[in-house]
């Protein structure tokens, strides 16, 4: 869930990433604007590849593990690309 994801990325997902670039937050189109936006694009694609699952599912089923892996990969991507985060240019960027 979102709270677990925020704990994983050590930032507030709602504050830092909810309206960043073309892919962070709801929806997305076009080319990612920078490496941070690309992390969101890859995260969206990862969720899209998790078949037959709802990101809110719980328990120890494969769905939860696949979603967790998507979130873990995104957290690593955000960490590795934190220097590209440019809120002055890409915050609330038109989607």
Swiss-Prot record:
Pfam family name, one: Phospholip_A2_1
Residue positions of the active site: 43, 71
Known cofactor(s): Ca(2+)
Keyword Nucleotide-binding: no
Lipid linkage positions (N6-palmitoyl lysine): 7, 10
GO molecular function ontology, one term from the record: toxin activity
Family annotation (SMART domains): PA2c (SM00085)
Main location as per UniProt: secreted
Name of the protein: Basic phospholipase A2
